[in-house]
């Protein structure tokens, strides 16, 4: 059986189809929302418009790659996180499309959250499907979150720690835009950082399971003002994020020893961060970029699990 996943975040419009019999992603597609040069994202009304405009053509594209008449359930990100009061208008576009698709074919509609989708995609891509059936520590690190979560699969989520101010993705994007790169700027910051061969010594602020990243933006601005080049400052920024995650992860492992640590969210696409963290955190799981950044893959997988059509316990 096939399941369809839809996610309309503040960064991208994403669709995916999952085959429950094969346990594989049949296809997925994503379109980043257009952001004007020099701007740090979109207003919610603009994001909602761009999602609404993009979805019909993207469904046509998906239909050319998978037989959508075989879809038996539809999953959608209806809000950012599975906590009370979590809401962003941009997700209404996905809910509208998913509702129309499901009603037209009398299919079950499973409303999920953007964060659950990130977690499920990362658990799947980690290659150990038992992660869906046991506890793990999961970092969701993006432009809207720097969350440390205790998860049982992607369904039961307990927040453990977060940033008290700026999110990691915001720090990366603000640096990238300051350097003249388009938003979202993570890929460009990573490319610049890879050019730096100098040693960098990150300075971070972590207290227990809570971090502060507001100082990172100021540190990067000062480094640029002091004459450091873009590659050095980009490397400094990413390694500060990496060191922050290392300290939070090891503090969490002191309280929850032996658990796997899974890293999800767009910022976790950075090769530099992955290398830095995996050398310092035991049992760390990073995944390929398309499973880390915004996607609908995790939503399509969770739709299958909600319908008991992909029981990982039997694998």
Model-derived segments and spans:
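A short helix-loop
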Residues: 8-9, 16-18, 23-28, 130-134, ...
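N-terminal phosphate-binding loop and adjacent alpha-helix
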Residues: 33-66
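Glycine-rich phosphate-binding/hydrolytic loop that grips phosphoryl groups
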Residues: 118-122, 287-315
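Short glycine-aspartate micro-motif
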Residues: 3-6, 73-75, 136-140, 262
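A contiguous, well-structured pocket-lining segment that forms one wall/lid of small-molecule binding clefts
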Residues: 190-261, 267-284, 304-312
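Conserved phosphate-binding catalytic cores of ATP/NTP-utilizing and phosphoryl-transfer enzymes
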Residues: 1, 107, 111-136, 301-305
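Short beta-strand-loop/turn "lid" adjacent to the catalytic site in phosphate-handling enzymes
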Residues: 60-99
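Glycine-rich beta-strand-to-loop/alpha-helix junction loops that act as flexible
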Residues: 76-79, 142-144, 262-270
């Amino acid at each position: 059986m096939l399941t369809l996943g839809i996610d309309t975040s503040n960064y991208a419009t994403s669709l995916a189809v999952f085959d429950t019999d094969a346990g594989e992603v049949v296809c997925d597609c994503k379109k980043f929302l257009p952001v004007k040069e020099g701007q740090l994202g979109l207003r919610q009304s603009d994001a909602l418009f761009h999602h609404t405009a993009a979805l019909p053509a993207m469904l046509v594209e998906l239909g050319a790659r998978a037989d959508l008449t075989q879809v038996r359930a539809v999953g959608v990100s209806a809000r950012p996180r599975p906590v009370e009061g979590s809401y962003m208008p941009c997700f209404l576009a996905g809910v509208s499309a998913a509702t129309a698709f499901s009603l037209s074919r009398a299919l079950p509609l499973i409303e999920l959250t953007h964060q659950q989708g990130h977690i499920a995609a990362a658990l799947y891509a980690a290659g150990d499907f038992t992660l869906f059936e046991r506890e793990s520590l999961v970092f969701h690190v993006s432009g809207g979150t720097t969350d440390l979560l205790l998860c049982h699969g992607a369904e039961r989520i307990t927040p453990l720690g977060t940033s008290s101010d700026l999110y990691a993705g915001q720090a990366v994007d603000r640096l990238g835009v300051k350097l003249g790169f388009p938003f979202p700027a993570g890929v460009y910051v990573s490319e610049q950082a890879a050019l730096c061969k100098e040693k960098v010594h990150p300075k971070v602020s972590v207290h227990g399971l809570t971090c502060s990243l507001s100082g990172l933006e100021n540190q990067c601005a000062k480094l640029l003002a002091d004459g450091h080049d873009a590659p050095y400052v980009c490397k400094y920024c990413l390694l500060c994020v990496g060191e922050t995650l290392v300290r939070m992860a090891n503090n969490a492992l002191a309280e929850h020893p032996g658990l796997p640590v899974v890293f999800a969210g767009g910022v976790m696409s950075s090769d530099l961060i992955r290398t830095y963290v995996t050398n310092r955190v035991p049992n760390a799981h990073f995944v390929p970029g398309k499973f880390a950044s915004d996607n609908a893959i995790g939503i399509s997988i969770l739709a299958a699990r909600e319908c008991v059509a992909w029981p990982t316990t039997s694998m």
